UniProtKB/Swiss-Prot annotation:
GO BP of this protein: leucyl-tRNA aminoacylation
One MF term in the entry's GO annotations: leucine-tRNA ligase activity
Family: Belongs to the class-I aminoacyl-tRNA synthetase family.
Organism, as annotated: Marinomonas sp. (strain MWYL1)
Catalytic activity: tRNA(Leu) + L-leucine + ATP = L-leucyl-tRNA(Leu) + AMP + diphosphate
E.C. designation(s): 6.1.1.4
Location of this chain's protein in the cell: Cytoplasm
Motif ('HIGH' region): 42-52
Residue numbers binding ATP: 577
Superkingdom per UniProt: Bacteria
Lineage: Bacteria, Pseudomonadati, Pseudomonadota, Gammaproteobacteria, Oceanospirillales
Annotated protein name in UniProt: Leucine--tRNA ligase
Amino acid sequence: MQEQYNPQQIEQAAQSFWDENKVFKAIADSSKEKFYCLSMFPYPSGRLHMGHVRNYTIGDVISRYQRMQGKNVLQPMGWDAFGLPAENAAIKHKTAPAKWTTENIAYMKGQLKELGFGYDWDREIATCTPEYYKWEQWFFTQLVEKGLAYKKTAAVNWCPEDQTVLANEQVEDGCCWRCGTNVEKKEISQWFIRITDYAEELLNDLDQLDGWPEKVKAMQRNWIGRSEGLEFSFAVEGKDERLSVYTTRPDTIMGVTYVAVATQHPLSLEASANNADLAAFIEESKKMSTTEADMATVEKKGMDTGFKAIHPITGEAVPVYAANFVLMDYGSGAVMSVPAHDQRDFEFAKKYNLAIKQVVQPAGDEVIDLEKAAFTEKGVLCNSGEFDGLAFKEAFDAIAAWMVERNLGEVKVNYRLRDWGVSRQRYWGTPIPTINLKDGSVVPVPQDQLPVELPTDVIMDGVNSPIKNNPDFSSIMFNGEEAERETDTFDTFMESSWYFARYCCPDSTDAMLTEEANYWLPVDQYVGGVEHAILHLLYSRFFHKLLRDAGLVNSDEPFKRLLTQGMVNKDGTKMSKSKGNTVDPQEMIEKYGADTVRLFMMFSAPPEQSLEWNDAGVDGASRFLRRLWALSYRHTNAGKVGELNIAELNGAQKALRRKTHETIQKVSDDIERRQTFNTAIAAVMELCNEISKFEDSSELGLAVEQEALEAATLLLSPIVPHIAHQLWSELGHSDNIVNTPWPTLDEEALIKDELTIVVQVLGKKRAELTVSANADNKTIEAEALAHPSVAKLLEGKTVRKVIVVPGRLVNIVAN
C-alpha cells in the first residue's frame, strides 16, 4: 500500500474498473427485491453546477447503500434536452440547438463519470431523440382519440413587431426582450390535456404517499385547490343569457352589490362596441401578465359595462363591471362581488364608489369597521331576510337548498387546478403529432407515420420558429389531399413527466413501455429540488395515472419516497452566475478529488436543508480522507492480523469493538430511516478517532482494528466510493466493495461488561465508579460510600438517604 493518498490516481482506477466490468448495469430479475433510485435528470446547459453535484451525490449514496443491502438496484441517468434556453444559446453562439445540446451532453456526461456516480449508462436517454419522443407522440394521439386531449383558444404573449409568440421568460417589464415592443395578449388555438378529470384522484392519492415530505403534499393540495361551493346564475337585464358564478361563501350572497366579469367576457366585448373608453381598457388589459403572482399584485381596475345583473333572491339590479382581475379561462369568467366580506371586492368598491352591504356579523362581541376593511371571517347572517341568524354551515345549506329548489343553482365541487396547456410556439421541442385539414378539422398523425421528426439542421433567426415557415415540414399530403402539420411543439414538462418509466425499457422499438417497466416501477426513491414540488411532480403523477389507465403500468403512483434537497449557497445566497458566487465542480474535482467533494456535500448539512459552501469545510473533508488512508496504511504495516476470538478480548479491545458496532447501528439507521447522511459521517469520524487512539499491535488487537477499519470503509463506501474501493483491496479483499454486503450488527458487542457511574453528594458530582454491568444496587451503594473522595466528604455527617439510578448515578443525601 502506498503511503500517500493520491485521489486522482485512485479515482481513475476505480472508475475504469466500474466501466470495464459494467458494475452498475441493471438487469430485471424477479427473484430479487428491486430498488429503483432516481435523481431528477438535468437540462444539458453545458456544465454541472454544485446543485447538480449535491442532488446526484445524494441519489448515488442511497443507490450504493441499497445495493449493499442485497437489492437489485436501478440508477439511470439521462437528459431533459428540449427547451427555450437551447434556442437562445444557439442564437448567441450561431449554431443549431441540436448541435449545442449534443456537445453539452457529451461534456456533462464526462463530469458525471468523474464524480463516480454509479449509473447504468446503457439506459441513458435524451428527450430530444426521435427514439424517445416517438412514444410521447404516440401516447398523445391515444389521448386525442380518447378525448383526454383537446384544442381550445387561450391567451399567449404576442409581439406585434416580430409577429411571434413569446414565452413568459421573454417578456421583460411588459416588453419583448428582443425588440422592446409592448407585448400583447393574443388568443390562439392550443392543445390541452384534461388533468382536471383526475383532480380528485390526484388529491386523494396524496394520502398514500407516506414517503413524501408533508410540505410538498401541502403544496400540491393547495395547487389542486378542492373547494365545495354553490354554482348559480344571475339574469342579465334586457338579455336572454345568464351570468354563471361559483362561490364557496353562499352565506354572503345577500351582500352582492356588483358582478365582475373578465375583460374578454362576451358582455364586456358587447358593451365596448359603443364605448371607446371601455374598448381602450380592454386593449390595455390584454397587455397584462396573467401569471398568478402578477395577478395578485396588479392594481385592480374596472369599468362599468352598463349592464345590470338581477340578484336571484332579492331581485335587485346590480351593476356589471369589466375587471382586469377576472380571467376568462377561469370558471365562467364572472364572479359575484361582496365588498363587505371580501377584501379585494372591498378595495374595488371603495375605488369605484360601489355599495358595501354587511350581511355577516361576528358571532361574539367583536366590533368591526366596514369603513376600513372587509369582515372576511365566518359569522352569523344579518340583513339577509329569512336567513338571518344562521351560522355559516346552516346558511350554506339553507341558501343552497333555496337555489336548488328553484333550479337556479347546484352545489358543486370545484378545483383551482386548470387543464394542462401543452402547446408551445417554439422550435426546440417535440412536434405535436396532429394534422390540420382544409375543412378545419384536426386529426392525429397515424401511428405508422410516427415519429414526426423535428428538423435539426436549422438556422435560428431569433424571431420565428424555423419550422413555422418551412413548407418541407409543414406541408403534407393526407389521404390524397393537401394538409398542414401542427407546427407547435410540446411543453417540455411532457418529456419529464414519463422519463422515469422509459428508463425501464429505453431500447424498446415496438412499444412505449414493456413488462419490464412493471418490475422496476414505481420509483422507490426520487431525489430533486423542492422547486419542482408542484408542476413537474404533479404532471408526473398525472401522466403515470394516464399510463396506468392505458394498461401500460400497474401502479397508481410513480414515486414512493421523495427527498427534496436544499440549495447550495455561497456567501449566504444561492449560487448563481449573476451574483458571481459560483464554484466550479470541475475545479474542485481537479484540486481535491471527487470523493472530497462528495464527502463535503453529504457532511455539511442535512439533505433537505440549504448547504453553505465553505472552503475550510472542503479542506476538512480532504484531511479526513487522508487520515483514513493513513490509519489504513499504519494498520497494513503493523504486523500479522490474527483471528478475531471474541472470548479472549481485553477491555480496550472490547471498547473498540463496541464502538465499531455502535457505529454500524447508528449509520444504518441514519441512512435507511432518517436519511441524515451528515450524522452518519460524523459517527464514522468518531470511530476513526477511536481507531487512531487504539495502540495494540498484538495479533488479536490488529484483528479488532481490522474489523473497525473494514466497517469504516464499508460504511463510507456509498459516500466516498473511490477511496473505499482501494482501501477494501488494501485490507486484503479480492471482491468488489460495491457488491459487498453492508456490515452486520453484532448485538452482543454492544453489551458493556462495565459501567461508569457518577457519584453525587448533595446533588454535586464528587466521584466516578467503574462497576460490573451486573452489579446490584447494594453493591453499587457500598462502593460509592467506600470511594475515598466520598468517604472524606462524609466524615462527621449522617447519611440520610442513598438513591441509586441503575446504570447512571448514585446520589447521597447527608447532613
